[in-house]
UniProtKB/Swiss-Prot annotation:
Protein name (record): Free fatty acid receptor 4
Disulfide bond residue pairs: C111-C194
PROSITE patterns: G_PROTEIN_RECEP_F1_2 (PS50262)
Glycosylation sites: N21
Record organism: Homo sapiens (Human)
Transmembrane portions of the chain: 46-66, 78-98, 113-133, 157-177, 205-225, 269-289, 296-316
Name of the gene encoding the protein in the UniProt record: FFAR4
Length: 361
């Protein structure tokens, strides 16, 4: 055997041993020390508040949109957005359990599913926002405001593609997250943690780069281009309007204003998503860099608060939507509850506005 082959054969076990003994990022597992109860109580208060607001807001938004008699493609996509938010916050109870127990005691199945569900719902959210922006741009460019949108079968196919692609794209996280023993700083002995163990570092790099590109940057670019085109068309149409318009033209102004309100709301949802999801994307990339620079320190507590900030996006989405587009519906609900007579008047007068629904297809 040549010296080179012997050296390579001797280095292989060393590399395997080094990979096995490498300290892995513990994600939500953390040894808090003397202030464990106080820190866990603060974390619980924050996440419970986010969970309650998000659950109430998304359920109310789902009900309000589902009650509309005319539900086009945009309405179906908005409903899909709220469903993705509800799926995302379903991970909060598991996160809180780990923050209290410090070690991972939930078993391997929960370890495989936790980050898979979180990544799946995030991917569905950004792809849904991109689909909404494209649908709105196509309708406005081709002047299809009053034309019937895609049928139920086309909407079902679109939603199936969004969920199917997101499920496949996030599948490696379901496979490679596993429970392993590791000694954390401040711990007297090894504890179980749920961590990501890729077979090879090049595989991890390729997946991270491709996922961020295809599921974050490309949909973001689609959204920016679509809304830029919509804004350009909106500004051009407003310049062509004059004060001395006929009744039919003033009717078109009202529709245009409602389209602009929808555009503004969806644009705010897109901006809030990128602001509140960018920190977790950056943190995941830093965890990848940690494989090459062991001196790069990322605290599990920092990761938790970054994830909590991302969870807050699920609470913000229905708030932005309800405040911007559903003020009249909420006013009608409150009036029906506190002032039945006034609520009945609002209900009767609102029937005539249903044909000008802000969620169109």
């Amino acid at each position: 055997m040549s010296p080179e082959c012997a050296r390579a054969a001797g280095d292989a076990p060393l590399r395997s041993l080094e990979q096995a003994n490498r300290t892995r990022f513990p994600f939500f597992s953390d040894v808090k020390g003397d202030h464990r109860l106080v820190l866990a109580a603060v974390e619980t208060t924050v996440l419970v508040l986010i969970f309650a607001v998000s659950l109430l807001g998304n359920v109310c938004a789902l009900v309000l949109v589902a009650r509309r008699r005319r539900r086009g493609a945009t309405a179906c996509l908005v409903l899909n957005l709220f469903c993705a938010d509800l799926l995302f916050i379903s991970a909060i109870p598991l996160v809180l359990a780990v923050r209290w127990t410090e070690a991972w005691l939930l078993g391997p199945v929960a370890c495989h599913l936790l980050f898979y569900v979180m990544t799946l719902s995030g991917s569905v959210t950004i792809l849904t926002l991109a689909a909404v922006s494209l649908e709105r741009m196509v309708c406005i460019v081709h002047l299809q405001r009053g034309v019937r949108g895609p049928g139920r079968r086309a909407r079902a196919v679109l939603l199936a593609l969004i969920w199917g692609y997101s499920a496949v794209a996030a599948l490696p996280l379901c496979v490679f997250f596993r429970v392993v023993p590791q000694r954390l700083p401040g711990a007297d002995q090894e504890i179980s943690i749920c961590t990501l163990i890729w077979p090879t570092i090049p595989g991890e790099i390729s997946w991270d780069v491709s996922f961020v590109t295809l599921n974050f940057l490309v949909p973001g670019l689609v959204i920016v281009i679509s809304y830029s085109k919509i804004l350009q068309i909106t500004k051009a149409s407003r310049k062509r309007l004059t004060v001395s318009l006929a009744y039919s033209e003033s009717h078109q102004i009202r529709v245009s204003q409602q389209d602009f309100r929808l555009f503004r709301t969806l644009f705010l949802l897109m901006v809030s998503f990128f602001i509140m999801w960018s920190p977790i994307i950056i943190t995941i990339l830093l965890i990848l860099i940690q494989n090459f620079k062991q001196d790069l320190v990322i605290w599990p507590s920092l990761f938790f608060w970054v994830v909590a900030f991302t969870f807050a996006n699920s609470a913000l989405n229905p708030i932005l939507y309800n405040m911007t587009l559903c003020r009249n519906e909420w006013k009608k609900i409150f009036c029906c509850f506190w002032f039945p007579e006034k609520g009945a008047i609002l209900t009767d007068t609102s029937v005539k506005r249903n044909d000008l629904s802000i969620i169109s297809g």
